[in-house]
Amino acid sequence: MRKRKNTRKYIKYIVVIICFVITILLMFVFKRNILNYNGLNKINIKEIFNNQNDKVIKAKYEKEKKPKIYSGNSRNVAVMVSNEKAAWPQAGLLNAYMIYECIIEGGETRFMALYKADNLPEKIGPVRSSRHYYLDYAAEHDPIYAHFGWSDLAMQRIKQRGVQNINGIYDKYYYREGGGYNNAFVSKNSILDFAKQKGYPLTTNKEFPLKLSGRNVDIEGENICNNLKLTYSQKHNVTYKYDAENKVYLRSMRGINHVDRVTKEQIKAKNIVVLKVKNFNLNDYVGSPRQDLNNIGSGEGYYITNGKYTKVTWNKSQYNQNTVIKDLNGKEIVLNDGLTFMQIVPDKYDVEIY
């Protein structure tokens, strides 16, 4: 009887020990799983946080990325540049942030090149005289306005509007190379020195007149533009050929590559804005009649960038108001960071896109 009791006692001890060992083992396994689970969660949470943080930083960077072509508070400067064939090739156009091309007398065109004062090239020209309708576009930029002479209407508007100008006829800040009419040039230092002498501000808070993005924004849709031809007159036409590798348009005039006089580099446009405007003759000049434009009002056109185009409408309510350009859905166009050519073309000619 006593022996049986001892056996039961031993069994009881063994069961207790086994239970204790099992409990210890279970605790060890459970603790290890908890640690592993927490460790995995820590890694996952850290990875998720880092990924989300990267996305937020990238999105913020993309949102805040500012265009280089028009940055800072440096004053805008407009220079009237000849585009008669005798003036080719011109100097300094590659530094411009925007260039307007409009029809003038004799079926020729003239450029108004716009720069930031801190990005003026050493040589700009040949510089020619002002025409009154360019001043309506210049008002959108509030620039120091450099020209060599003026038409009667341009003279009136410059004086009436108080345009801060540099006129080569009276202001000896230009220099000549060679003979003829297309031989006047102006330098960066001459413009800045004259501005300081006259007390013209060299800083501005003037915003870019159109929407401008620091990112590369493509036009929606499938309207491809690899080649563009614009006709200004029987004498003058402009063509662009798309360079898909660099996402720019290479510029030519009358079948000849448009190059810079100094660098010999072909002129490249990131954006091309075509505005169709009615032009007509004025009777204020003996010889080839000077032109006028119906550029205050509204019309149609095209916007071309990155190998695509969209039809647009334009509206300019008065001379000192910006030209508002919208696509056919009513959204204002967004220009990409780079040189923009504003092609103000006679509306009687077709725009060829292919």
Q: Where do the language-model regions lie?
A:
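Hydrophobic single-pass membrane-insertion segments
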Residues: 25-42
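Hydrophobic membrane-insertion alpha-helices, especially the h-region
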Residues: 14-29
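N-terminal Lys/Arg-rich, disordered targeting/topogenic segments
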Residues: 1-13
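Alpha-helical structural elements
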Residues: 5-8, 32, 56
